[in-house]
């Protein structure tokens, strides 16, 4: 099958530069996605064009400038590096695409099938460990849309999630373990937040997510297959079990929320301050929701989070990097592409 199947890796995307005009263009495409801000089109348009894009691009551009590399966007650079390493290990044609920005999914699929017309199938791997409406779901829908329009005779398969896959857990655990060798007071798992309504909208049962006590613990296969909250809790559970971390030494929080609607709690910035106020002097923070370092890890956690912790009385703040181009992650991702 390998000579008939190609692989498309898909990550989030990034502005082309730190120029506010490029950031504005990127934010428009990202935030106008109906799966990111899931309100009626006219409301979304008014919110984004009337409010957000008049204030956010300048602020976001300043944040991007703090973390921008000479080669470009860290997320793009790191995604390209890991892609090149994986490609050398996989005997299949491969392309890398982004959900938003110039490295579009349409461009990635077109390159894949133009260079390799013999392909009958594409395996698409979203670089998101956990399934969510605003990440994996929108990627799958966009790929299906392009395939139906431009490559209707080709077959599509995809990896929906890998939050509990053994090799991913092993790679995350090994990475974290390397940063826990020195004494620490608390470990905070910070995952990207999502609106609570995204969970209930995707729940195929209509009666489980956030509607029964301890919903993420009560077995419900259909709901949990698309439940971001359940999946991040499972990732955390598997990592702490593997490393033998006591229950009172770690907690879970959610970052990067937007105002105006309930998001998953507790919020990371609140948790960072709370832990410092409770006398935790040495904090380690990890974000397994991201496989490549990006604005949310390098700036939001690495800079803003550190400042918040130190200002609240903390003394040592350790941000664990993402898997990035670590060899065990490269081999894990290559395995997903091969099998």
What are these language model-derived features?
Residues 2-339:
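Active-site-proximal alpha-helix that buttresses catalytic centers in soluble enzyme cores
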């Amino acid at each position: 099958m390998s000579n008939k199947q190609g692989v498309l890796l898909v990550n989030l995307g990034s502005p082309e530069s730190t120029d506010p005009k490029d950031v504005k263009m990127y934010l428009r495409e990202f935030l106008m996605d109906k799966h990111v801000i899931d309100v009626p089109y006219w409301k979304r348009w008014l919110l984004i064009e009337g409010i957000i894009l008049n204030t956010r691009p300048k602020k976001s551009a300043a944040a991007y400038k703090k973390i921008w590399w000479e080669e470009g966007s860290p997320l793009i650079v790191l995604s390209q590096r890991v892609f090149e390493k994986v490609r050398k290990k996989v005997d299949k044609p491969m392309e890398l695409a982004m959900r938003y920005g110039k490295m579009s999914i349409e461009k990635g699929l077109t390159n894949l099938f133009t260079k390799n017309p013999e392909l009958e199938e594409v395996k698409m791997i979203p670089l998101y460990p956990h399934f969510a409406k605003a990440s994996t779901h929108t990627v799958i829908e966009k790929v299906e849309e392009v395939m139906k329009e431009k490559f209707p005779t080709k077959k599509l398969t995809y990896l929906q999630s890998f939050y509990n896959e053994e090799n991913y857990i092993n790679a995350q655990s090994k990475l974290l373990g390397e940063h826990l060798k020195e004494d620490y007071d608390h470990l905070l798992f910070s995952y990207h937040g999502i609106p609570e309504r995204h969970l209930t909208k995707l729940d195929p049962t209509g009666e489980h997510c956030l509607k029964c006590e301890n919903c993420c613990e009560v077995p419900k296969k259909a709901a949990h297959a698309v439940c971001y909250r359940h999946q991040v809790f499972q990732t955390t559970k598997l990592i702490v079990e593997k490393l033998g971390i006591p229950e009172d030494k770690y907690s879970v929080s959610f970052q990067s929320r937007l105002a105006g609607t309930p998001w998953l709690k507790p919020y990371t910035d609140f948790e960072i301050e709370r832990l410092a106020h409770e006398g935790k002097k040495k904090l380690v923070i990890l974000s397994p929701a991201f496989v490549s370092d990006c604005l949310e890890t390098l700036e939001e956690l690495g800079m803003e989070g550190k400042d918040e912790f130190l200002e609240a009385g903390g003394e040592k703040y350790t941000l664990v990097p993402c898997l990035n181009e670590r060899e065990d992650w490269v081999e894990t991702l290559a395995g997903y592409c091969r099998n």
